[in-house]
């Protein structure tokens, strides 16, 4: 969101529009990634290319990418959360003058470690073929773009939670004060009708964005580069549940007066 979209203009409609646009980004990046097989050598630790580095080639490329992006201010945005936050270089770009819209505890909520684990161990085997054909740098670039898009979508739960809290603070406050009532918070946050609409929409987008275009009018069936049902499953089993997890974590800390500033 642009600076002018924050604070008094923040609304569920504005956030919903952003989440819908983010669906496009995730699907297009997913289509790019599945052009390649898993290429498992990329993720093996330690990498044989860097004797003094204990991580994988993928981790090395990802950390270097985040370090460069940090220098130019990517992680000054409340919408962005690094996968490797330790020892990131300071930004040479001055921070935005936008007023803060989230509670300061938002900075402490980062589930990218969980997202990365799910991506490597569940999503890649689900979407990509089991082979190793090289092209490691290009494959990693696709991984990084897709992971950052998924992370942004999931951590947008902080904004969703903030707006819901502002709109219905009388409902959320007792549950937050109870602290342990995570199930009640999750129930209050869940709208099954909306989730079904999201699953259907992303499946339709995957079918449209990923269809193989042909000049033959009598083609018997449309071939898709990515299975629409798998994209729907991606949202159903991972993206939406993890987004709600972020919302719950944010709300449980929303009343922390010790860290509360003008919002």
Swiss-Prot record:
EC id: 5.4.99.5
Molecular function terms from GO: chorismate mutase activity
Leader sequence residues: none
Domain of life: Eukaryota
GO BP terms in the entry: amino acid biosynthetic process; aromatic amino acid family biosynthetic process; chorismate metabolic process
Expression by tissue: Expressed in root, stem, stigma, anther, leaf, petal tube, petal limb and sepal tissues with highest levels in petal tubes and stems.
Pathways involved: Metabolic intermediate biosynthesis; prephenate biosynthesis; prephenate from chorismate: step 1/1
Record-level GO cellular component terms: cytosol
Cytoplasm listed as a keyword: yes
Annotated catalysed reactions: chorismate = prephenate
Keywords from the named record: Amino-acid biosynthesis, Aromatic amino acid biosynthesis, Cytoplasm, Isomerase
Record-linked InterPro entries: Chorismate_II_sf, Chorismate_mutase_AroQ_euk, CM_AroQ_sf_eucaryotic, CM_II_prokaryot
Keyword Nucleus among UniProt keywords: no
Domain (Chorismate mutase) ranges: 3-256
Classification via NCBIfam families: CM_pl-yst (TIGR01802)
Complex and partners: Homodimer.
Protein known as: Chorismate mutase 2
Originating species: Petunia hybrida (Petunia)
Gene of this entry: CM2
